[in-house]
Amino acid sequence: MGPSQLVRAPRPPGLTSPYRRPGMGGPRRRCPSMFKCSRRTYRQKPRGPTATNPASEATNISDTDTTTSVLILSPRVLRFLCQPGGFLVL
């Protein structure tokens, strides 16, 4: 009896793949579970005399939606990312 003749135990009907884990199923979220991600959208309004000054119009970005994404990393993840040879892109 070779290795190809091994009898596998029948899987429960809910499980389709032998490699599926309870936490890995379903559609993938944008942030993995080890990252906590919070997103905020700010609405910037022109205010003060600089909003009407055409000279400062190049530096003043007015009426734009600014989305700020904040990643809160656990210390274990930070240690993993800051190892020698690893690089962190922000």
Curated annotation (Swiss-Prot):
Enumerate composition-biased segments (Polar residues). 50-63
Which parts of the sequence are annotated with region: Disordered?
A: 1-63
Q: Where is the composition biased (Basic residues)?
A: 27-46
Q: What is the protein named? A: PIK3R3 upstream open reading frame protein
Species of provenance: Mus musculus
